UniProtKB/Swiss-Prot annotation:
<dbReference type="InterPro" id="IPR050272">
    <property type="entry name" value="Isochorismatase-like_hydrls"/>
</dbReference>
<comment type="similarity">
    <text>Belongs to the isochorismatase family. RutB subfamily.</text>
</comment>
<dbReference type="InterPro" id="IPR000868">
    <property type="entry name" value="Isochorismatase-like_dom"/>
</dbReference>
<dbReference type="GO" id="GO:0019740">
    <property type="term" value="P:nitrogen utilization"/>
</dbReference>
<feature type="active site">
    <location>
        <position position="152"/>
    </location>
</feature>
<keyword id="KW-0378">Hydrolase</keyword>
<feature type="active site" description="Proton acceptor">
    <location>
        <position position="43"/>
    </location>
</feature>
<comment type="function">
    <text>Hydrolyzes ureidoacrylate to form aminoacrylate and carbamate. The carbamate hydrolyzes spontaneously, thereby releasing one of the nitrogen atoms of the pyrimidine ring as ammonia and one of its carbon atoms as CO2.</text>
</comment>
<dbReference type="Pfam" id="PF00857">
    <property type="entry name" value="Isochorismatase"/>
</dbReference>
<dbReference type="InterPro" id="IPR036380">
    <property type="entry name" value="Isochorismatase-like_sf"/>
</dbReference>
<dbReference type="InterPro" id="IPR019916">
    <property type="entry name" value="RutB"/>
</dbReference>
<feature type="active site" description="Nucleophile">
    <location>
        <position position="185"/>
    </location>
</feature>
<dbReference type="GO" id="GO:0006212">
    <property type="term" value="P:uracil catabolic process"/>
</dbReference>
<dbReference type="GO" id="GO:0016811">
    <property type="term" value="F:hydrolase activity, acting on carbon-nitrogen (but not peptide) bonds, in linear amides"/>
</dbReference>
<protein>
    <recommendedName>
        <fullName>Ureidoacrylate amidohydrolase RutB</fullName>
        <ecNumber>3.5.1.110</ecNumber>
    </recommendedName>
</protein>
């Protein structure tokens, strides 16, 4: 039987935190300060969310990604209005795939993009290659001034990227996750953040799995039970809107 706390989780907050909000979540609510929080948008690229992109070509079902894109767009708008830093990730490598690692890297053997290109050589240089359509963020989710865009060469957004140093420089402790794929890059990044003392929250309806539905369910179970918290876009937007409406 899972243990559920009745009180919200409250991190020891910095003296400069002006506003503290409480987000309904599983397994319990969690308090956060907007100025100490980042919204992480994981790999919302054509590769993962568009017909003809890498996941689609590799045989994964992406038919349900349109509502996810719409929900992420709502979450981004709410975050920007509340002063929450928005960070976009783009997964991939150079068009020669030197950064992907050769046969001495497990990435070479496990990356479905690399395996798909080995099966279909005509796709070489087109999947997850910087500068190509597949690598680009979807049209609906484009960065604005003040947002951060980070490339990442592996599943975790903390591995060989500036993420940790940027978060520390901005005094950020809470990470709200959206994006694709829940069971791969989202969960990998949240887990690594947990080990670095970041509080990770996933907005479930702003994520999508690579694989069958049970992969989504298993990832969310792991996160809420062992590594973080699970909420939804309506709760996130409503929580952020409350103090804004009071000052209007």
């Amino acid at each position: 039987m899972k243990i559920v706390e009745n009180q919200p989780v409250v991190r020891r907050q910095s003296p400069q935190a002006e506003v503290t909000l409480t987000l309904p979540a599983r397994p319990e609510a969690i308090a956060f300060a907007p100025q100490e929080t980042a919204l992480i948008v994981v790999d919302m690229q054509n590769a993962y969310a568009s017909q003809g992109g890498y996941l689609d070509l590799a045989g994964f079902d992406i038919s349900a990604t349109a509502p996810v894109i719409a929900n992420i767009k709502r979450a981004i708008s709410a975050a920007r209005a509340a002063g929450i830093k928005v960070i976009f990730f783009q997964n991939g490598w150079d068009n020669q795939y030197v950064e992907a690692g050769g046969q001495g890297s497990p990435n070479w053997h496990k990356s479905n993009a690399l395996k798909t290109m080995r099966k279909r050589p005509e796709l070489m240089g087109k999947l997850l290659a910087r500068g190509d359509w597949d690598y680009d963020l979807v049209d609906e989710l484009q960065p604005q001034a003040g947002d951060i865009v980070l490339p990442k060469p592996r599943y975790s957004g903390f591995f060989n990227t500036q993420l940790d140093s940027l978060l520390r420089s901005y005094g950020i402790h809470h990470l709200v996750f959206t994006g694709i794929a829940t069971n791969v890059c989202v969960e990998s990044t949240l887990r690594d953040g947990f080990f670095l003392e970041y509080f990770g929250i996933v907005l479930a309806d702003a994520t999508h799995q690579a694989g069958p539905q049970f992969a989504q369910q298993a990832a969310l179970y792991n996160i809420e039970t062992f590594f973080g918290w699970v909420s939804d876009v309506d709760s996130f937007c409503n929580t952020l809107a409350a103090p804004l409406s009071q000052t209007a």
